[in-house]
Amino acid sequence: MALKNFNPITPSLRELVQVDKTSLWKGRPLKSLTKGISKTGGRNNQGRITSWHRGGGHKKLYRIIDFKRNKIDISAIVERIEYDPNRTAFIALIKYEDGEYSYILAPQKLSVGDRVISSQDADIKIGNCLPLKCIPIGTTLHNVEMKVGKGGQIARSAGTSVDLVGKDSGYAQIKLRSGEFRLVPLDCKATIGSISNPDQKNINLGKAGRNRWLGWRPHVRGVAMNPVDHPHGGGEGKTSGGRHPVTPWGFPTKGKKTRKNKRTSKFIVKKRK
């Protein structure tokens, strides 16, 4: 989809760049595939902030997405492509031959009227879902499972994809956008193609208020705080913090590795760049 620029008739329109959504469905989502979602304001069940700078934002309905694609060997037709406020990718409403509706992540070049299927014998066609053992090397994939039957977890954001680069000893080797090479069981499923809305990375919100609509509050720098609030705080006049950058709890930031999951490190063939 193309990007949309605006004439600067107001200051906030001068820098505004949006994705053109004219080809998307303009009505409401399918009610049976939505549910309410409550705001947390970045707080956990104890009321403490666990995700800073969150709060407010427009009210949303959560669209129930089928990441598992468990309806095997039943063909479905794409009814429409929709906007989803809960993610950067677009979603597709599909109708199976038995009459059931479902939402899936919409890959690039999927259009209304196309047929998709989840099957071991499916064609290598955009939107089809197959086990990795049935997919030829070199194929571009998205919504890749990490555990058999858990549902897709890798490459679900706008414009993302992974490449299948090898198969060996019961595992498929995939290359992620980060440059990481990872092993995934061959029985895990993946969908053909890359995710829709690749221009998401080029948008410009144009004003602070548009970020507030998305649920983001102002991001306050540590050097602008008091010493009680942040290790960089305080000082007479404007100061630079006086130390290497740290988090509010005093741990080094800006590049320090924070990954703790040693249990799955054996599946990482090559670390990300």
Swiss-Prot record:
An example Gene Ontology molecular-function term: transferase activity
Regions crossing the membrane: none
Region (Disordered): 228-273
Keywords attached to this entry: Ribonucleoprotein, Ribosomal protein, RNA-binding, rRNA-binding
Gene3D superfamilies attached to this UniProt entry: 2.30.30.30, Nucleic acid-binding proteins, Ribosomal protein L2, domain 3
GO BP, one annotated term: translation
Keyword RNA-binding attached: yes
Compositional bias segments (type: Basic residues): 254-273
Function: One of the primary rRNA binding proteins. Required for association of the 30S and 50S subunits to form the 70S ribosome, for tRNA binding and peptide bond formation. It has been suggested to have peptidyltransferase activity; this is somewhat controversial. Makes several contacts with the 16S rRNA in the 70S ribosome.
Subunit structure: Part of the 50S ribosomal subunit. Forms a bridge to the 30S subunit in the 70S ribosome.
Identification of the protein by name: Large ribosomal subunit protein uL2
Protein species of origin: Rickettsia africae (strain ESF-5)
Lineage per the UniProt record: Bacteria, Pseudomonadati, Pseudomonadota, Alphaproteobacteria, Rickettsiales
Name of the gene: rplB
